[in-house]
Amino acid sequence: MTQPLVTTTRKGVIPTYPVLLGIVFAICTVGMTLNLVAAIATDVVDEGPRTLQEQLAGVIGFGLGSLAIAALGAWWCSRTGARSRLGAVLFGALCVPTLILFFSGAPGMFGATAAFLAGLTRGRTPSAGVPRVFGIVGLSVAILNVLVTILGVSIAWLGGGSPSAG
């Protein structure tokens, strides 16, 4: 027997899940994609192990894949309270090893999903205990992913080049 999740009219600075996920995707994945396209168009030379075109393919592929996994995972896990708690832990843990895919936005999207499933986004009832801890970790990673992407791209372009995405 499943019980519907109780939602609240929680207000605060943390937006609803679709808005939070959209912000992370737009800034990290779309923003980095546009950054790499601009770098390719302006013939910026990247001395990293991968070409700008390879980095672009990675950002798009991992970004879209992460978006699909995060959205489907949130949909499936949010159907019951037990799944939400388990999903918060799973996505909160998953956002840490995906830090290697930082500029694709993967850790931020998984972190936003952990925060949603832990009830930390607007319109949800917060969980207690371990799911809440993983939700806080996920929310922190999501915020940092956005801020560091903005800062990294800005500093790199002001310094005369494009940041390496991979």
Predicted regions span which residues?
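Cytosolic juxtamembrane helix and N-cap/initiation of the first transmembrane helix
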Residues: 1-63, 133-135
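Cytoplasmic membrane-interface segments at the C-terminal ends of transmembrane helices
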Residues: 9-17, 68-88, 114-137
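Alpha-helical transmembrane segments of polytopic membrane proteins
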Residues: 54-66, 101-111
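Generic alpha-helical transmembrane segments
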Residues: 59-75, 91-95
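Juxtamembrane/interfacial segments around transmembrane helices
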Residues: 65-71, 107-120, 138-151
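C-terminal halves and exits of single transmembrane alpha-helices
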Residues: 89-115
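Juxtamembrane membrane-interface segments at transmembrane alpha-helix termini
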Residues: 99-104, 120-133, 142-152
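Juxtamembrane boundary at the C-terminal end of a transmembrane helix
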Residues: 145-166
